[in-house]
Curated annotation (Swiss-Prot):
Residues 1-18 form the signal peptide. It comes from Bombina maxima. InterPro entries: Bombinin. GO terms for cellular component: extracellular region. It holds the Pfam family Bombinin. Belongs to the bombinin family. Expressed by the skin glands. This is Maximins 4/H3 type 6. The modification Isoleucine amide is found at residue 138. Keywords: Amidation, Amphibian defense peptide, Antibiotic, Antimicrobial, Cleavage on pair of basic residues, Cytolysis, Fungicide, Hemolysis, Secreted, Signal. It is found in: Secreted. Maximin-4 shows antibacterial activity against both Gram-positive and Gram-negative bacteria. It also shows antimicrobial activity against the fungus C.albicans, but not against A.flavus nor P.uticale. It has little hemolytic activity. It does not possess a significant cytotoxicity against tumor cell lines. It does not possess a significant anti-HIV activity. GO terms for biological process: defense response to bacterium; defense response to fungus; killing of cells of another organism. Its main location: secreted.
Length: 139
């Protein structure tokens, strides 16, 4: 009899616990849904504002680029153009952040490879000449 009582009480406790866990999960999922909806709204508003800002900046950058492209450029003008080009790339990277990071990585890698070639080219030439001289002396 005691065993039946213990089993019944254990079953009641387990079912009550399962119901409380299920209720907790439901309330958490409802909160998550509400938070996700509010985040979507915020992102939508932010996206609209960002698009408007990007369009204005792109227009300004194009006007400035046309102004500097038509006349003779000084070194200072050249720097301004470089900055404008960087701003345009940054604005484009806001649309496609993964592609922008890949382009930056690719550009960085190409710069590093060019530096290595500039350094290693003459060094390999000297090593090749030295080895050629050694082979001639040995042979």
């Amino acid at each position: 009899m005691n065993f039946k009582y213990i089993v019944a009480v254990s079953f009641l406790i387990a079912s009550a616990y399962a119901r409380s866990v299920q209720n907790d999960e439901q309330s958490l999922s409802q909160r998550d849904v509400l938070e996700e909806e509010s985040l979507r709204e915020i992102r939508g508003i932010g996206g609209v504002l960002l698009s408007a800002g990007k369009a204005a900046l792109k227009g300004l950058a194009k006007v400035l680029a046309e102004k500097y492209a038509n006349g003779k450029r000084t070194a200072e003008d050249h720097e301004v153009m470089k900055r404008l080009e960087a701003v345009m790339r940054d604005l484009d990277s806001l649309d496609h952040p993964e592609e922008a990071s890949e382009r930056e990585t690719r550009g960085f890698n190409q710069d590093e490879i060019a530096k290595e070639k500039r350094i290693l080219g003459p060094v390999l030439g000297l090593v090749g000449n030295a080895l050629g001289g050694l082979i001639k002396k040995i042979g």
